[in-house]
């Protein structure tokens, strides 16, 4: 089957689209990436998403309209990846669209029950591409008592499980998440959870203090030093004290968190602040490894993916943080995969599993009561 996976993440970089060929299903799936591209959001759409993400500034009219606008954006992104690959849209079998997360509440808060909302109307995508769309992957897991995240572990087992090595797959996107993939010889369970912020705080600080969208290659963070009192404040965040399975997002590490941090520590240089929040991402990862993974698993390799794997300052900090753990650290490209394409490929794989009516959540990662088939299916017009 030829499937396009569509992902728009918490970092709002743009729309990641991967054209993938998949043979079979389940752990025996054969997955080939044909082409990957990122289609940037225009400034108007990006600002509308940012407004929709803000509890203070959002409104139902905005979200209703944006749902259809993003559906059209996602459809155009599907057309673009096919065009770049010289692949006829008529040959496409399926689209797996994650959507744009507007709000994610994994745990009950007062009378607000666990819930999640991703937008990007699948009917618009199906109509514009004349292709069946599978979307809304998180909701069935949450209906089954899970947190709706992380969902990528299922695809990571298919792509990265090794005959003899125990691997950690560390994604550093807007949020960071880790998947523990025991070797094929092991009887230990796959586990996965969010470790905290990835690029989200770093990017927000860059935008506010340097008027830059992100810290390219970690060049600015390389110039500063870590401020202990800022790092201690960050590491005291309640999320780090929670036991897995757990997930987080912009609600905990977005604009509100950064506003409070910058107000509290405004006396410090902007370079030092950026260096310190970069170290916060690293320390939150290392903290979770040492508390929840390394006491129970012997890890041979850590494989980094996501935009953060291109931040050489962050990667070097992580190498230093794990230097005593006797594990090799790679980025996806070192073993023949694309860091950028990882999540888009994952949703192509999840769409394939739904098409075959196979469960594809990992209850040990999400906390769901059982394995479930994920996603809603939207057929194109006849």
UniProtKB/Swiss-Prot annotation:
Record's keyword terms, sorted: ATP-binding, Carbohydrate metabolism, Kinase, Nucleotide-binding, Transferase
Pathway annotation: Amino-sugar metabolism; 1,6-anhydro-N-acetylmuramate degradation; Cell wall biogenesis; peptidoglycan recycling
Enzyme Commission number(s): 2.7.1.170
**What InterPro entries does the record point to?**
Anhydro_N_Ac-Mur_kinase, ATPase_NBD
Q: Which SUPFAM superfamilies match?
A: Actin-like ATPase domain
Task: Kindly indicate whether the keyword Signal belongs to this entry.
Answer: no
- Name of the top EC class for this enzyme: transferase
Superkingdom of the organism of origin: Bacteria
Q: Which GO terms describe its molecular function?
A: ATP binding; kinase activity; phosphotransferase activity, alcohol group as acceptor
Write down the chemical reaction(s) this protein catalyses: 1,6-anhydro-N-acetyl-beta-muramate + ATP + H2O = N-acetyl-D-muramate 6-phosphate + ADP + H(+)
Query: Which processes are annotated in GO (biological process)?
Result: 1,6-anhydro-N-acetyl-beta-muramic acid catabolic process; amino sugar metabolic process; peptidoglycan turnover
- The UniProt annotation places ATP binding at 9-16
Function as written in the Swiss-Prot or TrEMBL entry? Catalyzes the specific phosphorylation of 1,6-anhydro-N-acetylmuramic acid (anhMurNAc) with the simultaneous cleavage of the 1,6-anhydro ring, generating MurNAc-6-P. Is required for the utilization of anhMurNAc either imported from the medium or derived from its own cell wall murein, and thus plays a role in cell wall recycling.
Q: Which family does it belong to?
A: Belongs to the anhydro-N-acetylmuramic acid kinase family.
Q: What is this protein called?
A: Anhydro-N-acetylmuramic acid kinase
Q: Which organism is it from?
A: Bacillus thuringiensis subsp. konkukian (strain 97-27)
Starting at the broadest rank, the lineage of the source organism is: Bacteria, Bacillati, Bacillota, Bacilli, Bacillales
Gene this protein is translated from: anmK
